[in-house]
């Protein structure tokens, strides 16, 4: 199997900066495994690497869809497999970087998924319908599938309708390892991680996250997949003059800390073979660890 390196961990753990250093030293290219960095023009709230950083090392699967688009795990796997194959064909090392645990798990082959390729135009049409009507349509198409889907989650109902309509596009991601992967997680003492998260949120406000949140709100707000993300939805009440900015900031800090805790729990229980490194000293050990692993046949 082809070798890849995966660098994961909770939000604000330092994955992006460390991955750039790794890629420079190991002749690698970075493949984002972040479910929000796929969106164009959402840079601050997603903690996306800068254009200058992207010029230092090639980054893939960043800025690939509009902020109104839906994007599934299946879409990610299709795109990531193609990018990884291309990187390997050019003699470089694919370095997968991101904290979206389901993306990582599925890419490694430990998650069986059923998916249909996204049809953006149809998704827009389906989004215009009320949830009740979508549920009725899904039940009429495939009652068995309807019984397995969270019927209160509009996006999952829409995805189920797509799969039910286009059975020929269904596919199974087999539950077996697809790559020879070294999977590394960055771990921080909770107090330090929370400090980093709180600081990041403050910096995001200074860097213009409110402008991005307003753009999402104008395009549909919570109705959009991008509008449900931590980092933007917390500012919608402020932009609607319902709460103060301080309250919105505090809410985002709290939501981000809770999200980090969930990320850690998921990664520890769902990703087989993950090796944890202390975030404070990971840079000192990482390159040597990877070089030793790459030398193994």
Swiss-Prot record:
It comes from the Bacteria. InterPro entries: Dimethylallyltransferase (IPR039657), IPT (IPR018022), P-loop_NTPase (IPR027417). The record marks 100 as: Interaction with substrate tRNA. The keyword Cytoplasm does not apply. Its cofactor is Mg(2+). Residues 34-37, 155-159 are annotated as: Interaction with substrate tRNA. ATP binds at residues 9-16. It catalyses: adenosine(37) in tRNA + dimethylallyl diphosphate = N(6)-dimethylallyladenosine(37) in tRNA + diphosphate. GO terms for biological process: tRNA modification. The keyword Transferase applies. Disulfide bonds: none annotated. Monomer. PANTHER family: TRNA DIMETHYLALLYLTRANSFERASE. Catalyzes the transfer of a dimethylallyl group onto the adenine at position 37 in tRNAs that read codons beginning with uridine, leading to the formation of N6-(dimethylallyl)adenosine (i(6)A). This is tRNA dimethylallyltransferase. The lineage of its organism: Bacteria, Bacillati, Bacillota, Bacilli, Lactobacillales.
């Amino acid at each position: 199997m082809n070798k890849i390196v995966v660098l994961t961990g909770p939000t604000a753990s330092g994955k992006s900066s460390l991955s750039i250093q790794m890629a420079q030293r190991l002749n690698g290219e970075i493949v984002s495994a972040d479910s929000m960095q796929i969106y164009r023009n959402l840079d601050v709230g997603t903690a996306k690497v800068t254009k200058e950083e992207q010029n230092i090392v090639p980054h893939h699967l960043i800025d690939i869809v509009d902020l109104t688009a839906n994007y599934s795990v299946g879409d990610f796997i299709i795109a990531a497999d193609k990018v990884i194959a291309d990187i390997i064909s050019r003699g470089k090392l694919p370095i997968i970087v991101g904290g979206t645990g389901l993306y990582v798990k599925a890419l490694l082959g430990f998650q069986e998924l059923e998916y249909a390729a996204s049809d953006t135009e149809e998704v827009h049409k389906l989004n215009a319908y009320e949830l009740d009507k979508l549920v009725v349509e899904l039940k009429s198409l495939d009652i068995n599938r309807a019984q397995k889907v969270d019927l209160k989650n509009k996006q999952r109902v829409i995805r189920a309708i797509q799969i039910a309509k286009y059975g020929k596009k269904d596919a199974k991601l087999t539950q077996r390892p697809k790559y020879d992967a070294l999977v590394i997680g960055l771990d921080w003492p909770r107090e330090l991680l929370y400090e980093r998260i709180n600081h990041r949120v403050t910096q995001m406000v200074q860097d213009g996250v409110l402008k991005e949140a307003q753009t999402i709100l104008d395009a549909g707000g919570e109705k959009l997949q991008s509008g449900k993300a931590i980092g933007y939805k917390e500012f919608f009440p402020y932009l609607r003059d319902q709460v103060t900015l301080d309250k919105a900031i505090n809410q985002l800090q709290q939501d981000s800390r809770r999200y980090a805790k969930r990320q850690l729990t998921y990664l520890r229980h769902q990703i087989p073979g993950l090796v944890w490194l202390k975030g404070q000293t990971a840079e000192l050990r990482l390159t040597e660890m990877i070089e030793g692993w790459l030398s193994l046949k």
